């Protein structure tokens, strides 16, 4: 790839390659420039620093999220949108961390927020509850995926069986008399692994709380 090919699109493409190959710890201006076969200063025409690089990636990530078709039930729309967000974040290493480390000030990200706000306006939510509700759901989805991605890194680094045995050994070292609930809930080491079912359960609990708050 020659210098004349350097633009925001190719910078994004190369940054994504680095994320998939080595993760966010290796995502630097120097490494992006090296993959583009240019010197780091050549990137400054498009992005000034790593923060702007992350902003670029965050906007790209948000552009991949499908907005659900309008439904009569706002809950169904939020379930579908939340699942769409989770799926996209899980498809890109460290995507949740990137969203958490950047400001929601880019076009695609603001449009995603706009569409989410629209769902609650159409549902005639109390005006003073809309922004809080959107923020709270966004925090839950992003935090859940961040936990999933950190968990997956541990599984990749240590191995599922090694982690399972560590849990079994650690729990066995504590008597049932001292920690009966630990023994009860940690009988199956796999029970703590994040999955879609647990994600949806948490989201449902949040939705029920929101419905109660607005008296629905």
Summary of predicted features, one role per range:
Residues 30, 39-42:
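Key DNA-contact positions within bacterial/archaeal DNA-binding proteins
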Residues 46-47, 133:
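Residues in the recognition helix of alpha-helical DNA-binding motifs
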Residues 67-111, 115, 127-130, 134-137:
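Hydrophobic alpha-helical connector segments
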Residues 122, 150-216:
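C-terminal peripheral helix-coil segments that are non-catalytic and often amphipathic
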């Amino acid at each position: 790839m020659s210098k004349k090919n350097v633009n925001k699109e190719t910078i994004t493409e190369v940054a994504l390659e680095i994320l998939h190959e080595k993760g966010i710890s290796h995502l630097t201006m120097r490494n992006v420039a090296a993959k583009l076969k240019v010197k780091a200063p050549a990137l400054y025409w498009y992005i000034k620093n790593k923060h702007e690089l992350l902003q670029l990636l965050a906007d790209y990530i948000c552009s991949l999220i499908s907005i659900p078709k309008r439904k009569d039930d706002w809950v169904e729309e939020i379930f579908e949108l939340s699942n769409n967000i989770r799926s996209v974040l899980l498809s890109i290493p460290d995507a949740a961390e990137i969203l958490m480390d950047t400001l929601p000030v880019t076009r695609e990200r603001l449009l995603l927020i706009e569409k989410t706000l629209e769902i609650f306006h159409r549902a005639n939510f109390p005006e003073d509850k809309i922004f809080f509700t959107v923020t709270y759901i966004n925090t839950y989805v992003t935090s859940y995926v961040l936990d999933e991605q950190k968990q997956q890194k541990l599984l990749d680094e240590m191995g599922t069986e090694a982690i399972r045995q560590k849990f079994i050994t650690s729990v066995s070292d504590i008597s049932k008399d001292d920690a009966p609930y630990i023994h009860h809930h940690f009988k199956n080491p796999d029970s703590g692994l994040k999955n879609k079912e647990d994600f949806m359960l948490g989201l449902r609990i949040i939705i029920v709380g929101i419905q109660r708050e607005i008296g629905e």
